Amino acid sequence: MYMATPKRQRAGAVLVLHSWWGLNDFFRRLCDRFADQGFVALAPDLYDGRVAVTVAEAQALRATVTASRKEPAYKYLMRMIVELRGAAAVDDIGVVGCSMGGHWAYWLAQRPDLPIVATVTFYAARDGDYSQSRSSFLAHFAEADEWVSTAGIKRLHRSLTKAGRAFEFHTYPGTGHWFFEDDRADAFQPEAAVLAWRRTLDFLKQRMG
């Protein structure tokens, strides 16, 4: 795991969930950026220190780690939530997840026993029962995404609407999957990333302030 703590007054606590590349430098820097804004940020390491660079490596790594984990990923994530709450001395937290991490963020946010009041996802959609969720949602989508279907986004929209949850969806023109991750040279879109970051901070501060 990686944790970053603010030097000034704290704004809250954020669990940062990495994409299928693993806990790489981008997600460590993302934690640092949250800390600069006053948040205690903790990024669990779902791959036990291993990272991937190519899609093929990521697919293989995810499959290998999933099959070999001694502690199920969901139990590990819930344990990390306990650790984050203790480190930040807070009751409620926010969750931010990219791609695979976004799927985990939605799964966690559905659980009424978890202290999640704000959920932010990048290029991820997961249908489910959100009727017992305590969270509000902010979802960032790419305009052209080969990994997230329009149908999947519509299903998520229906699920959140049916559950009466507060949510915002934003789609960024001219972007594809991983547009927020500045280490993905083939996908990173600086202008969209800046706008998504600003919206993310505003959302978290409003929900956790």
What are these regions (language model features)?
Residues A139-F141, D145:
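Short beta-strand/loop motif that positions the catalytic acidic residue
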Residues L30, S149-S159:
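Short alpha-helix in the alpha/beta-hydrolase fold that links the catalytic acid
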Residues V117, Q132-F137, A163-A166:
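Short, proline-enriched alpha-helix->beta-strand connector loops that line the catalytic pocket
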Residues A87-C98:
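Alpha/beta-hydrolase fold nucleophile elbow
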Residues A163-G209:
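C-terminal catalytic histidine-bearing segment of alpha/beta-hydrolase fold enzymes
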Residues L114-A124:
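A conserved short beta-strand
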Residues M1-A88, F179-E181:
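Serine-hydrolase catalytic machinery in alpha/beta-hydrolase-like enzymes
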